[in-house]
Regions:
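PP2C/PPM-type serine/threonine phosphatase catalytic domain
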Residues: 1-237
Length: 237
């Protein structure tokens, strides 16, 4: 829902197209709940992002209990909300949110994955994790159990910030340095997304690829009542 400053990437898992069902349920449910909450304060929005992801989780999990062909389905969910001059991210799984600011490419989220846990424990390097046979094993997702707790991140937007939300179909094929180079090149969000998808496919394109790029062209100074506005071009694929 770009006109409301709401962006969601969900990457489903499960056989017989169940993953697509899970990801669609997550996107629709989260978008519905957060669009209805438009106009809430930042503090209220934090709670509503958490509630929206947990609600989507419950709906997906309940469906797995009554439809045998949907058992085991689930999805990642990475949500970006632009709220005045602030951004808010809700995150479950191994899709990622990045921020390119002043030429520096930051990964804002941390993967909920087996290999990330091994990296955190010092058993694997990030380079080893990329090619590990269990690199696609996630430890937290939406719909796998009765409840889920999302990670929440927030910060202040600046003019010329560029956000990237992406599934592991992109980040597993294209290294961060290459993604950053694409975003630093001349172009628009639409062209950057096209280049990223083309590069992932050129390298083998082993998984579904989902990417959203959001560029903050302008962040107005807060008005006396605290309201700010933004010009936010976005592209997704």
């Amino acid at each position: 829902v770009p006109d409301r400053g709401l962006f969601v990437v969900a990457d489903g898992m499960g056989g017989h197209a169940a993953g697509e069902v899970a990801s669609e349920m997550a996107v629709r449910g989260i978008a519905r709940d957060l669009t209805a909450a438009h106009g809430a304060s930042l503090d209220e929005t934090v709670g509503r992002v958490t509630a929206a992801i947990r609600s989507a989780n419950a709906a997906i999990f309940e469906r797995t209990l009554v439809e045998h062909d949907k058992r085991g389905m689930g999805t990642t969910a990475t949500v970006l909300i632009l709220h005045g001059n602030r951004y808010l991210i809700g995150h479950v799984g191994d899709s990622r949110a990045y921020l390119l600011r002043d030429g520096v490419f930051h990964q804002l989220t941390k993967d909920h994955s087996y290999v990330q846990e091994q990296v955190d424990a010092g058993y694997l390097t990030p380079e080893q994790a990329r090619t590990h046979p269990y690199s696609n094993v996630i430890t937290r997702c939406v719909g796998a159990s009765g409840d889920v707790v999302p990670d929440i991140f927030s910060g202040t937007c600046r003019a010329n910030d560029v956000f990237l939300l992406a599934s592991d179909g992109l980040t597993g094929m294209v290294e961060d340095d290459a993604l950053a180079a694409i975003l630093k090149a001349q172009g628009s969000p639409e062209k950057w997304v096209d280049r990223m998808v083309s590069e992932a496919n050129r390298r083998g394109g082993l998984d579904n690829i989902t990417a959203i790029v959001v560029r903050i062209d302008e962040v107005d100074a807060p008005t006396p009542d605290g309201v700010t506005t933004q010009d936010v071009p976005a592209s997704q694929r």
